[in-house]
Swiss-Prot record:
Species name: Oreochromis mossambicus (Mozambique tilapia)
Site feature location: Nitration by tetranitromethane destroys a Ca(2+) binding site and inactivates enzyme: Y90
Name this polypeptide is given: Deoxyribonuclease-1
InterPro entries: Deoxyribonuclease-1_AS, DNase_I, DNASE_I_2, Endo/exonu/phosph_ase_sf, Endo/exonuclease/phosphatase
Lineage, highest ranks first: Eukaryota, Metazoa, Chordata, Craniata, Vertebrata
Complexes and interactors: Monomer.
Signal peptide start-end: 1-26
pH influence on activity: Optimum pH is 8.5.
Catalytic residues in the record: E103, H159
Catalytic activity: Endonucleolytic cleavage to 5'-phosphodinucleotide and 5'-phosphooligonucleotide end-products
Disulfide pattern: C198-C234
Amino acid sequence: MQTYRSRMHLVCSLGLFLTLLHLSNSLLLGAFNIKSFGDTKASNATLMNIITKIVKRYDVILIQEVRDSDLSATQTLMNYVNKDSPQYKYIVSEPLGASTYKERYLFLYREALVSVVKSYTYDDGPEETGQDTFSREPFVVMFSSKNTAVRDFTLIPQHTSPDLAVRELNALYDVVLDVRARWNTNDIVLLGDFNAGCSYVSGSAWQQIRIFTDKTFHWLITDAADTTVSQTVCPYDRIVVTTDMMRGVVQNSAKVYNYMTDLNLKQDLALAVSDHFPVEVKLS
């Protein structure tokens, strides 16, 4: 009996060890629209301390609505997140946009856990003629991780224009096809402020979006989610993965991170940080 109990104890201990090992090998991926992130916000220490806490929650995070032509605000953010120890590196797009209003896509990542393999900006047509598809074309990045089931995974970020959300979300299907042809991979995550809900995408409009109608795409942040800090209830921010990528996703780990509640902030301060909550998922 004692031998049996000892064996069972060993089995349970081994199971716990493997579970903890599995969790320690997971990556937390996030996407956060930090409203108008530029020098004004970067000069506010109160807001930057909150943003730093949010960013350091993640191993890889996409930051959107980066209004930073000379990357001075980005460098300020890097100084904050690396203050205690130099853990994070970044890769950033060029300023993107068909008009004088431009934004960057910014990825921060823990260099001890992941590295950038390659990147490119999707070519959606000539902006001068107004024939381009996206207001802010995706800046596609492939990351490599030694500790996850999917070693190399590709992130396709998108911050849609609200009034063009249906068209731009549908066009993401073409971006996926381009990534597959260019890099011979189908381990793909689409993420960002899709404006995919409430009045911007509703009813029959969903049937016009191929990454929704094609069931080889999995919407991990559902229509029931609320990604807005204000009183509205809208699932604007999303994470969508391909079937192949699902093998690297921790089941039921995708969620909205409510930093207002978690950091015990009043709503006006939370709104000063952003009008969006981050969305996240664990990769293992």
